[in-house]
Amino acid sequence: MAVKIRLTRMGSKKKPFYRINVADSRSPRDGRFIETVGTYNPLVAENQVTLKEDRVLAWLANGAQPSDTVRNILSKEGVLKKSTILNSQNKFKVG
């Protein structure tokens, strides 16, 4: 099962609001999901983003692939940098 971190559209017509969800890549955009890890509001001047960083890092460590838009959001929030640091630390452990 390929797992993706992607946006699910909420809100009303012409006023989008997105949830950042972890879902199976084969499920529809607004369909079944595994876990909600954040929200994204593009209508606010500063593009309001809330994230559960620990859960996002856990899913990335388990192999979840972010969509292009979510990858951009995570990099702006600094989560991807933490993920790469954690991955590089795990590679050097001997055990």
Curated annotation (Swiss-Prot):
Gene that specifies this protein: rpsP
GO biological process per UniProt: translation
**Coiled-coil residue windows:** none
Q: What is the lineage of its organism?
A: Bacteria, Bacillati, Bacillota, Bacilli, Lactobacillales
Q: Name one GO cellular component term.
A: cytoplasm
List the molecular function annotations (GO) for this entry.
structural constituent of ribosome
Q: Which family does it belong to?
A: Belongs to the bacterial ribosomal protein bS16 family.
The record's listing under InterPro entries reads: Ribosomal_bS16 (IPR000307), Ribosomal_bS16_dom_sf (IPR023803)
Q: What does the UniProt keyword field contain?
A: Ribonucleoprotein, Ribosomal protein
Q: What is this protein called?
A: Small ribosomal subunit protein bS16
Q: Which organism is it from?
A: Streptococcus pneumoniae (strain CGSP14)
